[in-house]
Amino acid sequence: MTNADPHELQKFSDLAHRWWDPNAEFKPLHELNPIRLSWIDAHAHLTGKTVLDIGCGGGILSESMASLGAHVKGIDLSTQALGVADLHSLESGVTVDYEEIAAEALAAREPGTYDVVTCMEMLEHVPQPAAIVEACRTLVKPGGWVFFSTLNRNVKSYLFAVIGAEYIAQMLPKGTHDYARFIRPSELASFARATNLRTADIKGIVYNPLSKHFTLSADTSVNYMLACRRDA
């Protein structure tokens, strides 16, 4: 059984044609991307590395990592999003190998294949996030890096990420997030530890409504990223 929520998939498929519009529904992803890209690259040194981007959507992160010289494969379960990703790759001239396949299925086919695995803004949209973490560990080479980003689960994150972002500032379409699926850093670290992934770094991402920019922070109370390594 696929570890995917049909309702979640449909939400993103319906918006797929707007994925690369920096002023539309995916504007926050465009604004987040330089921060997450530089953070990933600072740890993993992407040039020349084989990289898997799980839940790649329309390919914003996938293309940016490929632009740094990585050999990138992006996977997703949205046919529409992958169609947009393929088309944009052709238009931009940035080569990314896209495939419609579940992370668990690819893990069974290609264990220990990738230097770097990324799973960004995806875990909070699946029924069984721990299974995705386990697939990431299987897919990465010994000594490789795995990067996650998701949303903390507390009153502040509900107010900021759901009420604030979706209903007040209208940065995101209403219903983008299900608060019950938010994941505390301790829970994500526990998922990783259970698969023998070692946590190497954790950083928060903070949005300033005045400057309208995201910045890295020690504050992990809303958005955060976790870097893990599979020991050699």
Swiss-Prot record:
<dbReference type="GO" id="GO:0061542">
    <property type="term" value="F:3-demethylubiquinol 3-O-methyltransferase activity"/>
</dbReference>
<dbReference type="GO" id="GO:0102208">
    <property type="term" value="F:2-polyprenyl-6-hydroxyphenol methylase activity"/>
</dbReference>
<dbReference type="Pfam" id="PF13489">
    <property type="entry name" value="Methyltransf_23"/>
</dbReference>
<keyword id="KW-0808">Transferase</keyword>
<dbReference type="GO" id="GO:0010420">
    <property type="term" value="F:polyprenyldihydroxybenzoate methyltransferase activity"/>
</dbReference>
<feature type="binding site">
    <location>
        <position position="76"/>
    </location>
    <ligand>
        <name>S-adenosyl-L-methionine</name>
    </ligand>
</feature>
<dbReference type="InterPro" id="IPR029063">
    <property type="entry name" value="SAM-dependent_MTases_sf"/>
</dbReference>
<protein>
    <recommendedName>
        <fullName>Ubiquinone biosynthesis O-methyltransferase</fullName>
        <ecNumber>2.1.1.222</ecNumber>
        <ecNumber>2.1.1.64</ecNumber>
    </recommendedName>
</protein>
<feature type="binding site">
    <location>
        <position position="120"/>
    </location>
    <ligand>
        <name>S-adenosyl-L-methionine</name>
    </ligand>
</feature>
<comment type="function">
    <text>O-methyltransferase that catalyzes the 2 O-methylation steps in the ubiquinone biosynthetic pathway.</text>
</comment>
<comment type="similarity">
    <text>Belongs to the methyltransferase superfamily. UbiG/COQ3 family.</text>
</comment>
<dbReference type="GO" id="GO:0032259">
    <property type="term" value="P:methylation"/>
</dbReference>
<feature type="binding site">
    <location>
        <position position="55"/>
    </location>
    <ligand>
        <name>S-adenosyl-L-methionine</name>
    </ligand>
</feature>
<comment type="pathway">
    <text>Cofactor biosynthesis; ubiquinone biosynthesis.</text>
</comment>
<keyword id="KW-0831">Ubiquinone biosynthesis</keyword>
<feature type="binding site">
    <location>
        <position position="36"/>
    </location>
    <ligand>
        <name>S-adenosyl-L-methionine</name>
    </ligand>
</feature>
<keyword id="KW-0489">Methyltransferase</keyword>
<keyword id="KW-0949">S-adenosyl-L-methionine</keyword>
<dbReference type="InterPro" id="IPR010233">
    <property type="entry name" value="UbiG_MeTrfase"/>
</dbReference>
